[in-house]
Amino acid sequence: MADDLPAMAHGLSALSRFFIDDGTLGATLLRVAQLACQVSPADMAGITMLVDGRPATGVFTDPEAPEIDVAQYDTGHGPCLDAFRHQRVYRIDSIADDARWPEFARMAAAHGITATLSIPLSARGESLGALNLYSRAAVFDQLVTEQAEVFARQAAIVLSNAQVYWDARQLGENMRQAMQSRSAIDQAIGILMADGGRSPDEAFQLLVRASQRKNRKLRDIAAEIVEGVSRRGGAAAG
């Protein structure tokens, strides 16, 4: 119900207890969208965000949501996009009577949607996207809107923390791979130096030429050389 304060309290409590490492960033986004439906009278929810540099419905609770949103992404106009761009709340009480986004309105009406509510998601001064709620009935009154804004503010903090966490994890993984690559390359250079009496630069250039000739990454060529020596060493020891 629109005045279901216990549901809102439950949703906010669930957000505050959310463990970022419980899943992927996509799982975090989806959980936020699902909670938004639980604390509001919306029939479905989606989150507009940048995907590969372009606005898109990154997650949704119903496959109809991205089908509705595609009209605004194609035309560049719609409540979800405007909420994202301008960091303002946009509410449509009656799709049939709203003339601001005609293409979006036609698509929403075709899916039986009567009302929508788009709320910006921002934290630490950064625009993260927009939370979009859809209903087949005119249920987004002022109280629902205010409650949804409270939820969106808390959700934005969760999403921002999740983004920071997963960015840090990715950076750590990239650094780990870089260190492994550097180690393999250094070992391969040492092997080539010992094998042919080459200088460090000559050994490195040999790796580079092999990488270019075979159209493979330098670290993969190096790892193959190191693995080959390890296999020969193991066979000799056996």
Task: Describe the residue ranges of each PLM region.
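Signal-transducing coiled-coil/dimerization helices and immediately adjacent hinge/linker segments
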Residues: 164-238
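A short, aliphatic-rich beta-strand micro-motif
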Residues: 114-122
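Helix-loop-beta substructure at the N-terminus of cytosolic sensory domains
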Residues: 2-13, 17-60, 69, 77, ...
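Short glycine-/small-residue motifs
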Residues: 130
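Allosteric cytosolic regulatory segments
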Residues: 149-156
